Amino acid sequence: MKVRFLYQSLLQIAGLMYAIIKYNGKNIDSVDDYLPEIKYSLPFRGKWYVVNGGITQDTSHSWDILPQRFAYDFIVIDEQGNSYNGDKENLHSYYCYGLDILAPADGEIIAIKNNFPDCRIMSNGQTDPNTPDIGGNRVTIKHSANEYSTICHLLPKSITVRVGQTVKRGDVIAKCGNSGNTTEPHVHFQIQNTYHFYSSIGLPVLFSNIKAKLFEKYSMIDNRPLSEEQEKKGGYIYRGLLLENESLKNKT
């Protein structure tokens, strides 16, 4: 493991300890513990697939990593459930690579990382050991005093906004890439209570004006069971769903 990557892993651990102490162990363990202030749009156009994430511990992206507890990973798939066509190790073979990434709601750009290279696709399905940064290129947007979105793994030098700039829901802010700790091109999306990437508390993400349906071949491409509890919570999404925005005109 590279020294820089190890350093960031230690930052994650330190951030977790800091958050536990700062918030006195008052984490968000359920969507019933927090009422979102904003309803978000999906940060992209077209139809995408939820490959990771949910609102229960069983379906969580990373339950023990507090900022990512309610995070999601999105990819684009074809009718067979494949995320690429052609050479698996060629980034350009992936359907989502280079697609526009959008602001999920109105807000102010708080932080940007824009100069990390795309990582290689490894034949063993693991992440690139030379990854210089876990989150890769990313944008953090302040939507309210208590809600910030972070979008990770963006294409190098594709970010079109600057710190301090205000954005509107649906504005193009970057393109999908493969920077950071990732096995293939995808969008990582999370809502957190501060702008700190490592020491914030992850918040449930409530979406509005989206179309969602379970991918009919889910069980053929993913052997992880789905939670019945997931399906009872309106507005919250979970892995296995195909999603798209109905409209980007709704406001906060």
Residue spans for each PLM region:
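Conserved positions in beta-strands of structured domains
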Residues: V51, E108-I110, Q192
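Generic structural motif
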Residues: W48, I101-I109
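Short glycine/proline-centered loop/turn elements that form peptide/ligand docking sites
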Residues: T160-R162, N178-P185
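Acidic, glycine-rich catalytic/binding loops that coordinate metals and/or anionic ligands
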Residues: Q190-T252
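Zn2+-dependent peptidoglycan hydrolase active-site motif and core
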Residues: Y95-C96, D106-L155
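Short histidine-centered loop motifs in beta-beta connectors
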Residues: E147-G170
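Short hydrophobic beta/alpha edge segments that flank linear recognition/processing sites
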Residues: K168-G180
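Cationic-aromatic interfacial patches
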Residues: M1-N24
